[in-house]
Amino acid sequence: LNCSKLIKQQGLKNVVVTNGYICKEPLTELLYYIDAMNIDLKAFSESFYKKVGGDLETVKATIHHAAKRCHVEVTTLIIPGENDSEEEMKSLSSWLASVNPEIPLHITRFFPRWNMRDREATPLETIYSLSVIASKNLRYVYEGNI
């Protein structure tokens, strides 16, 4: 927060890249100094967030609140067998469009690394097909890590 204030005083822009885990009160205070956010929406199922130690509703609330105050973009890393279903992308993109259909969505390709070497990289066909699905609800959809 302190750095954001100093940066604004210098006439510069603040961009936050975040997983979206922040309570409403500090987020509200921070947003006075933020120009843009890229929020990682890991999946659109509570079960996935429980598995990775998070909470979908908190991230959704952050996206909703931030979108009222600054430019927001959302990134979803597509992991084979975890969050790569067409139904999940329909739900995710429909919900995001209900917040604002102008919010850009970045659908990015997973590559096996670290503790997740037990699966292959996301097939390109999956990224492209999920992008088509999301584009039915959102104006700006981009494929990444391809």
State the predicted function of each range.
Residues 111, 121-146:
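A C-terminal junction/extension of Radical SAM enzymes
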Residues 1-120:
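Conserved AdoMet/S-adenosylmethionine-binding subsite of the radical SAM
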